[in-house]
Amino acid sequence: MSSSEQQEVPGLNEKSETLASVTTNQDKKREELVIDYNVPDEFEYAEGGWKAWMAILGSFLGFFPTWGFFYTAGVMQNYIAKHQLATVSTSTISWIFSVYNFCLLGSFVFSGLYFDLNGARRPLILGNVMFLTGMFALGNCTKIWHFIVCLGILVGMGSGIASSPLIGVVCHHFNRRRGIATALAMNGGSIGGVVIPLMLRSLFDKSGYPWAMRSLGFLSSGFLVCSVLLAREDPAKLHKPEPGSLMRKSSESSFVRSFLSYLSGSFDYKALKEPKYLFCTLGCCMAELSTGATLTYITSYCEQVGYQDEDAFYIITVLNALSIIGGYICSLLADVLFGRFNVMIMINLLLGIVGFVMWLPFGSKGSGIMYAYGAIYGALYGSMLNLAPVCCGEISRVDEFGRRYSTMYALVGFTFLAGIPISGAIIGEGSLESYNNVIIFFSAVSIAAGVFYLLSKCFALQNPLKKNDTKESDFPGTLARLIKSSLRRF
């Protein structure tokens, strides 16, 4: 090598250091973007195996009676409005189902944090006992306050307390295939939504209302006992509080004291300061309100426009049956092709559009239209329910999922508490014009849900409101970032 080649070139080191610095900064930015894409954790997931699939089976069996009955709300509302509560107005009866939906969804918060710290068994036992007590007592209900206590509080709260751990155990065992796994577990509720209306319709005629409810209680008992035995968490993913913290102290005390302590800290206020979580929660509130109110009133709508009783029953059955198939297919597409948030956004927008272009103008033109609408709505609706916890998990650590998911559904419960009576008030005495107004309300709320999920996705990928370093206001840049984030797979 020549002496000139051995000499150090002036400025070369400085340029190399500058280039290395730029490269390092670019790498850091890429790392930050990856961190924004998915909430990182240090856990390993089975993605299958005996324990994981038994947990899925346990969740499936638990959802069959608890959420299967939730999907049957329209059948129950229509039946008691014509028999036990025939002299009571629609808006008054709607309070029963408003309390029921509020207790079911709001009581997630009672078990979410407890599951994160201690696992599934105790909240499952507590929730199942409450559910079965209310179910057996329903057979003796004759007054509105009877239904509020037994159906609204006991059945509703029992279902909600059991639901958070049933979803949580799925997230403990699956990450990459979480959408499909959640769909398989929650399809228990969809299948229950097919079986229970048919079962009740037959038993109402043959055995009468009291024994119909008791028979459903006996059937539910077998499913729920198996659920407690099979739905097990992964102990490695239980949240471990810091030494000396309130959670640590309460977890080492008695069950009653620990439950009260967990209850006081179970609502995750800090999470609501995250825009991605806040908009995800708002999207879930709007989506659940729209679909829950639709299930509650679609049966009475069918009877108002003159369709036969069996049509009202079977439309709900078709809706729930198609939710099984649609829920699995859309969850598979979410995991493999499009991303969980993208599918959730499309589903909610389509639910609103179908309401505007199909149910509103043509719902009263023939029962065949409502069967077709029920099939389309069910195919979309099933995947919406399956992906709600998956989207929450997409922006949450797995050891904090129970608390964040239950906080989200506590707010959904409050939305139901106001939304169902509002829907009942819009319907009023039940004229076709009033039902058309409530269809507009349902559809608009679904579209709003899609918009909120879109905003959540944008903030999860990159904050579109982040200011430019050199400008105080950068509206074109903000709009560009928003559009860019909205088009990405997530």
Residue ranges of each PLM-predicted region?
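Conserved MFS/SLC helix-loop-helix module at the cytosolic interface between two early adjacent transmembrane helices
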Residues: 106-146
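Helix-to-loop junctions at the C-terminal end of transmembrane segments
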Residues: 106-120, 326-340, 358, 427-428
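C-terminal transmembrane helical hairpin of 12-TM major facilitator-type secondary transporters
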Residues: 305-307, 311, 317-322, 327-329, ...
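A late C-terminal transmembrane helix in Major Facilitator Superfamily
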Residues: 395-432, 442
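Intrinsically disordered, low-complexity terminal tails of fungal membrane proteins
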Residues: 1-49, 233-264, 459-490
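Extracytoplasmic gate region of multi-pass secondary transporters
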Residues: 65, 69-80, 269-332, 341, ...
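Intracellular juxtamembrane helix-capping segments at the cytosolic ends
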Residues: 80, 152, 159-174, 181-182, ...
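Hydrophobic core of transmembrane alpha-helices in multi-pass small-molecule transporters
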Residues: 64, 131-135, 145-161, 165, ...
